[in-house]
Curated annotation (Swiss-Prot):
Gene designation per UniProt: Mfsd6
UniProt region (Disordered), positions on chain: 28-47
Topology within the bilayer: Multi-pass membrane protein
Chief location bin: membrane
Protein name: Major facilitator superfamily domain-containing protein 6
Record field: transmembrane: 74-94, 106-126, 133-153, 289-309, 338-358, 372-392, 453-473, 482-502, 510-530, 547-567, 582-602, 608-628
Amino acid sequence: MAADDKVAILTDDEEEQKRKYVLADPFNGICREPEPPSNETPSSTETSAIPEEEIDWIEKHCVKVNNDLLISKVFYFFFYSAYGSLYPLLPVYYKQLGMSPSQSGLLVGIRYFIEFCSAPFWGVVADRFRKGKIVLLFSLLCWVLFNLGIGFVKPATLRCLPKIPPTAHPTNVSHPVTVLPMNSSTVAFFSTPPKLLQKRDVQLSETEPNISDIDLVSTALTLTSEPTRRPQTEAITHPVTGLILNTSTVTLPPTGNVTRETTIAVVTTTKSLPSDQVTLVYDQQEVEAIFLIILVVVIIGEFFSASSVTIVDTVTLQYLGKHRDRYGLQRMWGSLGWGLAMLSVGIGIDYTHIDVLIDGKGCKPPEYRNYQIVFIVFGVLMTMALIVATQFRFRYNHFNNSDGKGKEVEIPQVERDNSTESSEETPTAATHSQAFNFWDLIKLLCSVQYGSVLFVAWFMGFGYGFVFTFLYWHLEDLNGTTTLFGVCSVLSHVSELTAYFFSHKLIELIGHIRVLYIGLACNTARYIYISYLENAWTVLPMEVLQGVTHAAIWAACISYLSAAVPPELRTSAQGILQGLHLGLGRGCGAMIGGVLVNYFGAAATFRGIGMACLVILLLFALIQWLAVPDEEEDKTMLAERIPVPSSPVPIATIDLVQQQTEDVMPRVEARLPPKKTKHQEEQEDVNKPAWGVSSSPWVTFVYALYQVKELIQLTRESRASEIQPLQVTLCWASVASAPLLPPCSSKHMGNRKTGMLAKDISGLRSLCHSVYQVA
């Protein structure tokens, strides 16, 4: 009886279709759409409605989730949680190690350059040898090992030194010490070496009768003089720094006929200075050693770990298939994890401190935060991302598309569809490539119109790199806490997500160029506002502008350039833009910004970059007004399928599935189907029995009048052009070709008897002909 069970047969057919669909295109499945209702039996709807009621909430919302995209979401969450818990705090961690702003900016900015160069390299290696999963896992392992190594670097030694103002004629340590006659001998003391106190020379004048009044913390001075003029060298030891100073030459002037040796006894005076007269200084030799060690670790670690995000982005885009515009829905989980991790770690650091050993007395111990918590959290979260990454599936079937053969033999229909689509679009792509090659792309981007947009993209990346590196540095100078840093991170990421979802609407409303105007204006206001801060917590209102100055600017630039080039060159244009904005822009912002902060201070640098934003805004507006006509701006051509990153890590720059370049084209809106008549809807409704023409002449006459009346009513409403032809025309063609039994009689005439239909076949042919003429 199983063969007679139509419901069981339907279930088997549906499972077979699903299996074929999954084998045919494993990366295009986003959600399982409901199967169309079958019209083979009236009871199918009743039987299908029963299981839907029995499906519980867990099976409906969890079982039907796409597992591949779920893995991508979880990976993005853990990876960017680890990234957000550590990397925004690295500049202030370097500051606590005793590094200068220029050194900190170099350590942060060099990552962008290495990442931009190494990520495409490892992507090509992974594709060439088909070892994407191994490269991904190795890069994530390097993330854990090399970054944890930075957290175990021992800080430089802190020394407590007196703050004695220099006199009018300071002497250096390399100058000889001259001792005048004993009645008024003056010893020109030394200054600390330049590596201990930069630009500070200390001179100590002491008279021998008042030598006990030397105002030093601890000084041991030994002088040995002879009546001759023979130079004598002595070693001067400074217990404060614990260093043995260079030897000095002591020359005694003639004191008459004195033949005996004169020896000055050792005088040691210990006296604690007030805390306002001493300062804490890092040992610069140790700081330089720490800087070189971390620099080597960063260069090696970043080279091997930079490819992880590129590979995961590429796999996620393959999972999405034709639905690449949904990349932002996957990537937003990373931004969510970033904000939550940054806030949690910031609160935890505020309640943990470490004790610092100081070489010297009189200095107040500083309040140092325990940043080892950050590295521990980073290691745990990145390890979780490494475990999740083992579940990624890597398919390299796109490399075999040129052979024209597939391993699956059950999907010929899908392969034929893809071949027909590619064959239809091949001539246009060939003509585009002949008329528009890569050098034409370079010439286009070097023009005034698009070159100015690229410069704005670079400068906005410069500003983002500077803010990412030195915003928390400046807020810490204003007594800002890591909890404040976490709140700032949450606000900025919420702003970026909001701007991401509404950026294309904003571009469509006001245009690409005006969005760039707004971004430059917001940057000007934000930087100048930050430069005049006195309370660190007042920075929060300006953090909501992060979405406009980052996400909206990126979307406008990449959409503007993508609309100007043909589809086959969009990947190249995207790579050039990413290189300028994410690589060169942010790297220069961190490194050049560090040099400026080192010489002018953080507040003055913020103010200067804000004024530079204003100048660039005016120049850019002038260029667009003079050199670019208004008709060049096409607001309708939007590259909505290109993802918008909301982090310093660039997205994939290599298009591995080049056969799907047509998927990046702006989608064509589907036309609405023509309006159907009420009778057509009733005829196509499988829940109602078939309503066909009866053998009775009265029913046939009423049926014809009803059709004519409905057609006349629709014609009066000026909708006749949008109406589908009645299905009776199909009956007319079938009747004309089959004199005995029309094929459509099974649908329109129900389960009528064949003999009755044969009697009325001639009348039905004339009826169909008349209705067809009226339609």
